[in-house]
Each structure stands twice: as structure tokens, then as C-alpha cells.
Amino acid sequence: MQLNPSEISELLKSRIEGLGASTDVRTQGTVVSVTDGITRIHGLSDVMQGEMLEFPNNVFGVALNLERDSVGAVVLGDYTGVSEGDQVKTTGRILEVPVGPELKGRVVNTLGDAIDGKGPINTTQTDIIEKVAPGVIARRSVSQPLQTGIKAIDSMVPIGRGQRELIIGDRQTGKTAVAVDTIISQKGKGVTCVYVAIGQKASTINNVVRKLEEHGAMEYTIVVAAAASDSAAMQYLAAYAGCTMGEYFRDRGEDALIVYDDLTKQAWAYRQVSLLLRRPPGREAYPGDVFYLHSRLLERAARVNEEYVEKFTNGAVKGKTGSLTALPIIETQAGDVSAFVPTNVISITDGQIFLETDLFNAGVRPAINAGISVSRVGGAAQTKVIKKLSGGIRTDLAQYRELAAFAQFASDLDDATRRQLERGKRVVELLKQPQYQPLQVWELAVSLYAVNNGYLDDVDVAQILAFEKSLKDHLKAKHAALIQRIEDTKELSKDDEAELAAAVQDFKKHGAF
């Protein structure tokens, strides 16, 4: 058998041409179908799980299902321009968002693009949205307080920096109000805030941004908005994008606070994406990994130690701990906290603040049920003066709730029971607080001191809040040094306590009450 040189060259040429084509096929594919923002792509044999894909007309997607002969991907943004037969390219990158201090004061979408009409964001740094949470060795215990400025929370359910505290309740019980008040309360405290709005009406998000601007809170806040009109994929990924933006500050030895409003809608969006990708449904039609959806997100909120920060910054920041505090919000249906998603998130977080419709309708706002609200780690981080003064509040409230139920049926009550009921009524009234008015530490300390020491026992229940306001005005006018000391030291020394007692007695004697 003789080989013709021309045949050999032709054979090699065809082999080389075929080699080039096969290499191209591995990084380029064809859209087979498009349905509700989900595309099925053939030919992307080199794609990674979670990789960004480039569609025509500068549209991007994320590969979520890697199957034998096709890839299931979600389109981020408008999918109406994507059609069958379009060419799709791999990018070799996991989904990233811009990070850095330049984002403060801006409203961005899930991809970090500005949507507030104030022009592009000038940041050069980006980071991936899916990251592994810090390990056990990298963490520090929660020991620094994060003041919410809300009387009921700071006294009974204290939150520490690096904690995950769930806010749970039915619709229209004031969940967002608690979170927004907490953001406003961080003014001047060196805490960067991230507010992630998931599946909300655009008008509602606009109202929150406007309120934050009114109270000067937008200058240290980033708003990540995935409105109800955005695709399910954008809503599901928004929480991870916001978390990455908050982690930027945590990893550099700073403190950050992130609010997820709310994770129920994120779970709904993820369920929608999973069902469209034809993943097998489980309980309540959620996919099997819905617990992991929330656990991998909330575990990224942590207080990290000095070694972690120093290693991350290559020695640029030394001797500083960083923290990311998370306030996830969950919406329940008819108070059912034993549903699938609420029980998942309760088990992941370090405590929960439970808001009740009945209390809200009765005018107790914030409508916090102190009996079943708990902070598992915040006690160690509570401000000393508040810890000292708030011990009796929860007990008074618990006894009042118990006795109030019996008092409805009993006609004659003994004096001790009557006193407890009267004290309880005053505690409930004192813990009421108008929205957008978070308190400073000294204001909360004075209120707790007055109720604990019986100074409110002879004040009419309807006059409690007016008494509290007048007392604070009196202290501002005549005892400015005292309240400044309490605010600075966060403690109540014996001398200061004696001065405070004298000041309250003087106010009661010569004031309007």
C-alpha cells in the first residue's frame, strides 16, 4: 500500500479543521428553547455550574442545570430578545457584582447596575455573589451591641454585631418598619447598611428610599432592589448580591448590617426557577435544597477575628474585627410559624422577633410579642446600662400577660395582683414607639429606670408617653452632663444613679406630672 503525500496533507488538513470546530463547540452553544426566562442550550460542554453566559444583544444568564446533552440556564433581565437558534458563549466567570464604598447612597439592581437615575457607579472592584462563609476558626463570639433604637428590642431582644436575628410576622405587622428604624439608628455609628428588597412593589421600595433620605441614612446605605416586576432569577439572586456588597466591609475590619426584605419571596422565586428547570418538587412544591438556599446565605453573616481581617487585607488592616449583622424578614400566613420556610429560617438564625397582628391592631406598635421573641446570643452583647435596667421588664410583661387573661373572669383581685396588672399596663404603654424615631442609649436607660423604680406607677396610663417625653426634655435642659456621661460610658454608676433619681423626683414634684 502506497501513501500519496497529497492524500496525507488533505487528511491532516481535515483533522485540523475538525479540531478547531470541536474546540469552538465546547465554549459556544445554541439556544434550543426559551420559556419564562429559562433557556435550554445545546453544545456548551465546558460550562461551569453558576457560570455567566453571554447571549446576543448584551444579555447575560446563569447556568444552573448541567445535563448530559443540554444546559438549563436562567436569563438575567429581559428574556424577550432571546430566541431559538441564538448563539450563546461561556464567559469563564462566575456571576459577579461591583463592590466598594462607591455604592453607598445608591439604588442598584441584582447585577449592581444603578437604577436611581444618578449616573453610573465609579467602582473598579467586583466580587462573586456565591462565596463560602467564614470557617469556625475565623470567627469571634458576638460581644458588641448593635443598637436598633427600638425600646422593646434593645431591652428584651438585644442584637449583637455579627448576629442573625429573624423578624417574622404576618403581612402589615410592621416588619419593614423595624428594619428601617434599625438602619436609621446606625447614623454616626460607623455601620454600613445594605437593604435588599426582594419581590416588593416598586412604589414600596421608593417609599423606603425616600424615608432613608429624609433621615440622612442613605449616605451610609446601599439599596439592592429586585422588584416584583423583575424576573424570578433576579429576585432569587438579589440576596446573594447584597450579601457580597456587605461582606466587602466585613472583610476589611468594618461593621455592616444587611436587611433581607423578605426571604419568603426569595424562596418563592427560587421555587419558580426550580420548577421551570424541572427539578423534582418536595414539601409545599419547594425543591429539596431550599434549606441550603437560606443557610448558605445567612451563614455569611458573622463576626470575624483580627487574624482573618489581617490575612484578607494582606496586613493593611491590623487589630480590627469585622462584622456583618443580618436581619432576615419572613412573612407568615395567619401566624403559622410552623410552615416550611419559617421553621427553616428560625433554625438557622440566632433568635427571632415575632410581630403579631392582634397587638398591631390593638395599637401596640412595634407589635412585638415578648413571650416568644428571643435573642440567643445578643445578651452577651447588650449594653451594660440597658442590661442592668431591663431585667425586670420581660418578667413584668410576662406576668401581666398571664394575669390579664385571668383578670377578665375575676371580679375581685387582691392588691398584689392589681399592682402587677397596673405595672404591666404601664410597661406595655412605655414600649410603644412612633416610627422613624429610634432612641439613643441614654433615652432608653431613663425610660427603663423610671418604670423599674415605680416612678410611673401613679401616672395615668394614657399619659405615659407624654410623661416620658417631658422627662427627657427636662433632663436635656437641666442635666445635660449626666445624659452625656450615660451615652459615652454606656454605664450607670452609683453617683449617676443618685443624680438621675433626684432629677426624676424633682421633675415629678415641679413638672407638669
Swiss-Prot record:
Pfam families tied to this protein: ATP-synt_ab, ATP-synt_ab_C, ATP-synt_ab_N
GO molecular function terms noted in the UniProt entry: ADP binding; ATP binding; proton-transporting ATP synthase activity, rotational mechanism
InterPro entries for the chain: ATP_synth_asu-like_sf, ATP_synth_asu_C, ATP_synth_asu_C_sf, ATP_synth_F1_a_nt-bd_dom, ATP_synth_F1_asu, ATPase_a/bsu_AS, ATPase_F1/V1/A1_a/bsu_N, ATPase_F1/V1/A1_a/bsu_N_sf
Name this polypeptide is given: ATP synthase subunit alpha
GO cellular component, one term: proton-transporting ATP synthase complex
Nucleotide-binding as UniProt keyword: yes
Signal peptide positions (record): none
Residues that, per the record, bind ATP: 169-176
Key words of the record: ATP synthesis, ATP-binding, Cell inner membrane, Cell membrane, CF(1), Hydrogen ion transport, Ion transport, Membrane, Nucleotide-binding, Translocase, Transport
Catalytic class of the enzyme: translocase
Gene encoding the protein: atpA
Subunit-structure text: F-type ATPases have 2 components, CF(1) - the catalytic core - and CF(0) - the membrane proton channel. CF(1) has five subunits: alpha(3), beta(3), gamma(1), delta(1), epsilon(1). CF(0) has three main subunits: a(1), b(2) and c(9-12). The alpha and beta chains form an alternating ring which encloses part of the gamma chain. CF(1) is attached to CF(0) by a central stalk formed by the gamma and epsilon chains, while a peripheral stalk is formed by the delta and b chains.
HAMAP family noted in UniProt: ATP_synth_alpha_bact
